[in-house]
Amino acid sequence: MIKQRTLKNIIRATGVGLHSGEKVYLTLKPAPMDTGIVFCRTDLDPVVEIPARAENVGETTMSTTLVKGDVKVDTVEHLLSAMAGLGIDNAYVELSASEVPIMDGSAGPFVFLIQSAGLQEQEAAKKFIRIKREVSVEEGDKRAVFVPFDGFKVSFEIDFDHPVFRGRTQQASVDFSSTSFVKEVSRARTFGFMRDIEYLRSQNLALGGSVENAIVVDENRVLNEDGLRYEDEFVKHKILDAIGDLYLLGNSLIGEFRGFKSGHALNNQLLRTLIADKDAWEVVTFEDARTAPISYMRPAAAV
């Protein structure tokens, strides 16, 4: 049986919020079977818990934000991408502020934290959402689609008319049956244009942003001294974001996601459209791991 997974141990980290610039204390904790991923604002009294579900997404400007009443948790997508990539079904994410720390702008530090905590299998079957037929949403020239696929695949295309992007790969397709999330996707950093960052700061956004946690591009070059981590790091980060956004379904996917210039808003619209169309998907489990189209790394001992 493919079993649900949680963390073996509690692990903590400190960082800053990309948009708020605030110092944030992050604690990842094991959670019981069928809990899902739950964000907890421990700076509030009483503590407010917000499950990582598509219906709890309230804002999608610059990042994916979970909302419950007037309480929010910003920038959940990179941590959720790491949870999805490592097959974590159940965990509590405690935060001392309203934003998940940006770390280095990728999912890499979160992968390291989760692997350091160790993975614990639980005595319950892991539930997958299998796409049964195509579902799509469009907005202008942007498009996001789910199609049936016996595995998990994410294809994405960006289209930036900018000197840094011309001649560089703007399309990528990752089939996770043959490609490692950790090696090929998790280290791709978020990116931004210097002109946009200056404007965002004037609006009290991106206050924590720097070349330490993002790829920063000016009119004709990448400003980061070390350059890019992957030749196609820009589009790979969009794949990383999409994986995090898709994990708001609450389960791992069996199917393919295709995005063309899609972002957090359209990704969430696609999830809501899928959820509402009960004939387009089904929940499945696997009694025999050998018959499953998706496999996960074996739980390693805690470091």
Swiss-Prot record:
Cofactors required: Zn(2+)
Entry's EC annotation: 3.5.1.108
Residue positions of the active site: H264
A GO biological-process term: lipid A biosynthetic process
InterPro entries named in the record: Ribosomal_Su5_D2-typ_SF (IPR020568), UDP-acyl_GlcNac_deAcase (IPR004463), UDP-acyl_GlcNac_deAcase_C (IPR011334), UDP-acyl_N-AcGlcN_deAcase_N (IPR015870)
Keywords, comma-separated and alphabetical: Hydrolase, Lipid A biosynthesis, Lipid biosynthesis, Lipid metabolism, Metal-binding, Zinc
SUPFAM superfamilies with a match to the protein in the record: Ribosomal protein S5 domain 2-like (SSF54211)
Pathway linked to the protein: Glycolipid biosynthesis; lipid IV(A) biosynthesis; lipid IV(A) from (3R)-3-hydroxytetradecanoyl-[acyl-carrier-protein] and UDP-N-acetyl-alpha-D-glucosamine: step 2/6
Keyword Hydrolase included in the entry's annotation: yes
Catalytic activity: a UDP-3-O-[(3R)-3-hydroxyacyl]-N-acetyl-alpha-D-glucosamine + H2O = a UDP-3-O-[(3R)-3-hydroxyacyl]-alpha-D-glucosamine + acetate
GO terms of molecular function: metal ion binding; UDP-3-O-acyl-N-acetylglucosamine deacetylase activity
Domain of life, source organism: Bacteria
Gene Ontology, cellular component aspect: membrane
A Pfam family that the UniProt record links to this protein: LpxC
Protein family membership: Belongs to the LpxC family.
HAMAP family the record matches: LpxC (MF_00388)
Function: Catalyzes the hydrolysis of UDP-3-O-myristoyl-N-acetylglucosamine to form UDP-3-O-myristoylglucosamine and acetate, the committed step in lipid A biosynthesis.
NCBIfam families from the UniProt entry: lpxC
Name of the protein: UDP-3-O-acyl-N-acetylglucosamine deacetylase
Encoding gene, per UniProt annotation: lpxC
